Amino acid sequence: MPIQLIFSFNFNKYFQVISSIGGRYILIAGGVFLFFYVVFKNKVLAKKIQNALPKNKDYLREFVYSISTILIFGLIILNIIGNPAVRPHTKIYDDIAEYGWLYYFAVFPVMLIIHDTYFYWTHRIMHHKSIFKIFHLVHHQSTNPSPWAAYAFHPMEAIVENGIFIVFAFLFPLHKSNLPIFFLFSILYNVYGHLGWELYPKGFNKSIVGKWVNTSVCHNQHHKYFKGNYGLYLLFWDRLMGTLRNDYDIAFEEVKSR
C-alpha cells in the first residue's frame, strides 16, 4: 500500500491546521488566564475553588504539554481531512443543501452526547492502574488546574482525546463546518472545566437542568482527588454509573457561598 494512503504530510497545510487549533486555544485559554490569574487575580481569589494558586512551573508544564497536544491534534486531523486518499471515505460533506439546515443544527446535540460518552469511558479506562501512568498521569499532575491544563496531555492521551475526531469523521454525515464549530464549543467548555473558578450560579447544581451538567467544581474535584467525576459536558454517566462524588453538592455550595 502506498504510504500516502495511510499518511499524508504537507507542511503548509499542517501549519494552517495547527495555527487554527493553537490560535483558538491560546486566545481562549490565554484570555481567560489573563483575566482570572493576572489582571483581576486579587479581586477574585477569595472565590477560587482551591484557595491556592498553581506555581509558575505548573503553568509552564501545562503550556508545554498543550503545545505538544496541538501538534498531535494537527497531524491526526490533517491525515483525515487533508489526505486525498482518506477524505473521500469520510462522512464529511461540503454542501449544506445535501442534508438541509434542520439536519445541520440537529447534529450538534448528537455530537455532544457522543463526545461526552466517548470521553467518560476512555477517561475511566485511562484511570486503570495498568495504564494510568502511561496515558493520564501527566494531566493529573495538575492537581490544582489552570486553564492551560485543558490540553495538557501526554502524547499518548492526546491521541486518545483526538480519537473523537476520527469517530465523527466516519460515523455519520457532518458538514465540514460542524466540526470546527463543535470543537470551538468543546475547548470553551474544557477551559471552563479547568478554570479554577465556578461560573454557574448558586443552586445550579441542584436545578432540573444543572444536576445533569458538569461544572468547574465537579471537574476540579476530579483533579484534586483523582477518583470520581469522570464526565466532560454532562453528569449523566457519572450519575448512572455511581461515580459522582458524594461530596460534590457540598463542595459546589461551599464555593458559591463565599
How would you describe each model-predicted region?
Residues 48-70, 93-104:
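Interfacial transmembrane-helix boundary/kink motif in multi-pass membrane proteins
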Residues 23-36, 67-83, 109-112, 162-167:
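Hydrophobic alpha-helical transmembrane segments of multi-pass integral membrane proteins
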Residues 111, 115, 119, 214:
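Active-site alpha-helix of zinc metalloproteases
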Residues 76-114:
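Juxtamembrane helix-loop-helix connectors linking adjacent transmembrane helices
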Residues 18-19, 105, 109, 121-122, ...:
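Hydrophobic alpha-helical transmembrane segments of multi-pass membrane proteins
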Residues 42-51, 80-92, 128:
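Membrane-helix interface/capping segments
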